[in-house]
Amino acid sequence: MENLLQQLISLDQSLLLSLNGSQSLYWDEVMSLITTTWISIPLFIALIYAIAHSSTPRYFLATVLAIGLVILVCDQVASGICKPLFQRLRPTHDPAIMHLVDIVDGYRGGRYGFISSHASNTFGLCVFLSRLFRHRGLTLMLILWASLSTYSRIYLGVHYPGDILYGALVGILSGYLLHRLLLWAGRRWNLFPPHRTASFRCTPSGYRVADVKMVIITLLLTYASILVWAALGIGR
């Protein structure tokens, strides 16, 4: 058992070193931007608008509360339980590997990294919102958003791939269960929005397709802005 654990740790370290960093200042800047929370603010604003536009006030409040619970549960499981429990050092703090890790602008993150809060939060929201809107295009964009956000943590050297994998699994389970809770609450207290008329094209769950497309465009424009911003930021 101890042998197997050591093999898994060695594999995790090898994967990290093969995926971490690059020789490009441009991609250093791109990943430094993608990893920040504030870069997703336009996406969250667009999502809130899309939810509000197709919901009754009660259902809107219930949905926002459920989204808040996704973030709270994922963050507390990752940072409040797993990190202090397992105390696995981040690659940037691990004496066995820290001198081999490519870091950007001196950023090393906190002391412990298992499991990744970024992974649990982003994949939790990805699953919850995908099941909420039930629109294939938005689901693909949310998977891209969660994947890029979590890969940026490996690129910057602050998480092992294993931290990301288990964080994502916690997020996926949390997002799924909390969406089921929202559905139960909607049926229990009759919170669902009224049936949409044929005058609007809607997703199977009742959200306007035009609003969903607006969310997708917002995310695409955010990534386009990151690419331009990173190009302008080279050499700073």
Name each region found by the language model:
Residues 1-43, 78-108, 195, 232-236:
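N-terminal transmembrane-helix/juxtamembrane module of multi-pass inner/ER membrane proteins
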Residues 34-51, 65, 118-121, 141:
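Hydrophobic alpha-helical transmembrane segments
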Residues 42-51, 68-72, 214-230:
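Hydrophobic core of alpha-helical transmembrane segments in multi-pass integral membrane proteins
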Residues 46-52, 147, 169:
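Hydrophobic transmembrane alpha-helices of multi-pass, membrane-embedded glycosylation machinery
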Residues 48-52, 74, 78-87, 130, ...:
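Membrane-water interface at transmembrane helix exits
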Residues 48-77, 139:
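Interfacial segments of alpha-helical transmembrane regions
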Residues 65, 69-74, 78, 166-174, ...:
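Hydrophobic faces of alpha-helical transmembrane segments in multi-pass integral membrane proteins
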Residues 102-236:
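Membrane-embedded catalytic cores of phosphoryl/pyrophosphoryl-handling enzymes
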